[in-house]
UniProtKB/Swiss-Prot annotation:
Underlying gene: bssE
Name used for this protein in its record: Putative chaperone BssE
Binding-site positions, ATP: 47-54, 108-115
Segment forming the signal sequence: none
Keywords: Aromatic hydrocarbons catabolism, ATP-binding, Chaperone, Nucleotide-binding
GO terms (BP aspect): catabolic process
Family matches, as InterPro entries: ATPase_dyneun-rel_AAA, CbbQ/NirQ/NorQ/GpvN, CbbQ_C, P-loop_NTPase
Induction: Induced by toluene.
Similarity comment: Belongs to the CbbQ/NirQ/NorQ/GpvN family.
Database matches in Pfam families: AAA_5, CbbQ_C
PANTHER family reported in the protein's UniProt record: MAGNESIUM-CHELATASE SUBUNIT CHLD, MOXR FAMILY PROTEIN
GO molecular function: ATP binding; ATP hydrolysis activity
Amino acid sequence: MKNSGLLNSVHVPAADPYYYLNTETLSLLNRIQRISQKHPVNVLVIGKQGCGKSSLVRQYAAVHHLPLATFQIGLLSEPGQLFGEYALENGETRYKQFLFPQAIQTPGCVIHLEEINRPEHPKALNMLFSILSDDRQVWMDELGLLKVADGVVFFATLNEGDEFVGTELLDPALRDRFYVTAMDFLPNDVEREVLQKKTGVTIAQAEEIIGVVNSLRASPELGVEVSTRKTLMIGEMIAAGGSLREAIAASLQTDRETLESVLLSLHVELGKTERGTTEYVLFTPR
């Protein structure tokens, strides 16, 4: 596996000026920050796809001016793969260290273990047990003794549910090492405000989008779940001049039959009269 494919660079992210969080979760994060000043701490963030789990981790790092390192756990297929790999270099086999060992030894680093329940092989997480335990250290023949630095906060995020292909149930022994917080979609009034500020749609357009989103979320038989991320995508498409139909068709990842069912449902429930017309034109350099 290539290093660049496993992780993103360490940096202090910019804060989102329109990031909203419920007071209960905010209170928990404040306590996590205090605990981290005494010793490293682990937090598991669970919730539906696209409800802002990764944004929460990024905003925590931004608010506290801490470096953030993100690791895609879904790319792991064997133990130790987070730490490095053997590679052929100038005709010799050498061990190439990845960013993870550096990140865990950086004081105050926020480490995001993204989709922790989706490794390619369950045993790929074995070496995390020691890192996330009270011991906070692991021995590797290639790197020696690695100790987690003071102030490090591990955030693990996961989508729970049978609808996520490749998702493994998180090992109870691993889960036991985390504080847990759950996230859900934003309330309508907050989601409406975020939609306006982040995408630039008008108040009327935001109201219309939220109405459509509520209708879809209240119709599980359609098999379409509209996340906050998707809501923002719909808003951006409309702000760029697209129609509601165009925005829905382009933003919802579903097959044509389901899409037609969704559009028909919206037409019946909300009285939407937009009609789709397909015309083919040349798409060539001018």
